[in-house]
Amino acid sequence: MKQKAIYPGTFDPFTNGHLDVLERALNIFEEVIVVIAENCQKHALFTIEEREAMTREVTCDYPGVTVEVLHRGLLADYARQVGARAIVRGVRQVKDFEYEFQMSLLNRQLYPEVTTVFLMPNVKYTYVASSIIKEVAMLGGDVSKFVHPCVLEMMHQKREEQN
């Protein structure tokens, strides 16, 4: 039986830190579904369609990876629906862990068969957060070390649209 996991996030934008966690997940699971979720509590720079397109572009050469969009509903229900037994979460620092730990307990209550797997990215990505990358890029800073070239191009386009 193939081991399947989901890797959810808003991915606004999809960073090299996200990619690092995905690569680590692929060392454990045969199939990983990157789930792009809408989060009404966050102000997105990119539309969900743009985030889906960038994520598909970044991950297109990774066997075992698919990209899906979750417009609404509970992540635990989605995991059950697709037959995933694990939810992958990247944890960069203690603050991330505190939030993710609470979410993992809730998801386990909703879907007892699911396990949350916490993966730490390479140390060079521990300070890379989408919110920081967006801010630096929109102010004209160089974020090329932190995102795939297609994401960088999309960020340049967004900056031009806003100026």
Curated annotation (Swiss-Prot):
CDD domains (alphabetical):
PPAT
Q: What is its EC number?
A: 2.7.7.3
Cell compartment(s), UniProt:
Cytoplasm
GO BP terms in the entry: coenzyme A biosynthetic process
Any one annotated GO CC term: cytoplasm
Recorded protein name is: Phosphopantetheine adenylyltransferase
Which key words tag this protein in UniProt?
ATP-binding, Coenzyme A biosynthesis, Cytoplasm, Magnesium, Nucleotide-binding, Nucleotidyltransferase, Transferase
Residues reported in the UniProt entry to bind ATP = T10, F11, H18, G90, V91, R92, E100, Y125, T126, Y127, V128, A129, S130, S131
Q: Which reaction does it catalyse?
A: (R)-4'-phosphopantetheine + ATP + H(+) = 3'-dephospho-CoA + diphosphate
- Return the Pfam families for the record: CTP_transf_like
What does the record give as cofactor?
Mg(2+)
Which pathway or pathways does this protein act in?
Cofactor biosynthesis; coenzyme A biosynthesis; CoA from (R)-pantothenate: step 4/5
What quaternary arrangement does the UniProt entry report?
A: Homohexamer.
Role noted for this protein? Reversibly transfers an adenylyl group from ATP to 4'-phosphopantetheine, yielding dephospho-CoA (dPCoA) and pyrophosphate.
Q: Which domain of life is it from?
A: Bacteria
Q: Positions of the site: Transition state stabilizer?
A: H18
Sites where the protein binds substrate? T10, K42, L75, R89
Molecular function terms from GO: ATP binding; pantetheine-phosphate adenylyltransferase activity
- Tell me the protein family, please: Belongs to the bacterial CoaD family.
Question: What is the protein's species of origin?
Answer: Pelodictyon phaeoclathratiforme (strain DSM 5477 / BU-1)
